[in-house]
């Protein structure tokens, strides 16, 4: 849920390992982290904020101004400084030491339920699994493409996925892996 409990069309995408991605949001409408970072702040469903108002509030706090000045120079926080700070922060969030990662290195053992989840994830539909790894593969569990996730579209067809960015019929109901 977003601002004042408003319900959006999609769940939030993961914010880790963004340095390896080549598009952002489930529909790929942003090509870089920098293109992405300010959109949720200004979206009427997510944070419903006016960027100038956010900058005004940030600039009212002396500690924020001092921190931004140390990092970026000028004393006044600008939109460019804000997106740069958010981009820099997001690019530091890296996952590579989860329990699953540790199990691959034989540092820990998955419990039976976790191991069943692993089996389902990596086993094809034809062999009794969920087939997740057909799209979610490699070290980042993504092939960085757009695919139909196999779920039925919303009854009102309100979320056309990648099609809303490209306008191409072939992109209807495709989402980032």
Predicted feature residues:
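Short glycine/threonine-rich turn/loop motifs
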Residues: 1-39, 101-177
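Post-cleavage N-terminal segment of exported redox proteins
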Residues: 39-42, 47-125, 133, 137-142
């Amino acid at each position: 849920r977003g601002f004042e409990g408003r319900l959006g069309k999609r769940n939030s995408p993961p914010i880790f390992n963004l340095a390896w991605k080549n598009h952002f949001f489930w529909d790929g409408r942003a090509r870089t982290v920098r293109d992405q970072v300010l959109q949720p702040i200004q979206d009427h469903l997510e944070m419903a904020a006016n960027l100038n108002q956010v900058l005004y509030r940030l600039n009212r706090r002396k500690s924020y101004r001092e921190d931004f000045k140390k990092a970026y120079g000028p004393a006044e926080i600008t939109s460019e400084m804000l997106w740069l700070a958010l981009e820099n922060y997001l690019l530091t969030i890296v996952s590579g030491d989860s329990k699953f990662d540790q199990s691959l290195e034989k540092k820990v053992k998955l419990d039976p339920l976790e191991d069943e989840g692993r089996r389902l994830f990596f086993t094809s539909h034809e062999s009794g699994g969920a087939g997740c790894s057909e799209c979610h593969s490699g070290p980042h569990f993504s092939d960085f493409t757009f695919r139909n996730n196999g779920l039925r579209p919303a009854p009102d067809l309100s979320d056309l996925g990648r099609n809303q960015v490209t306008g191409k019929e072939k992109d209807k109901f495709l989402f980032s892996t």
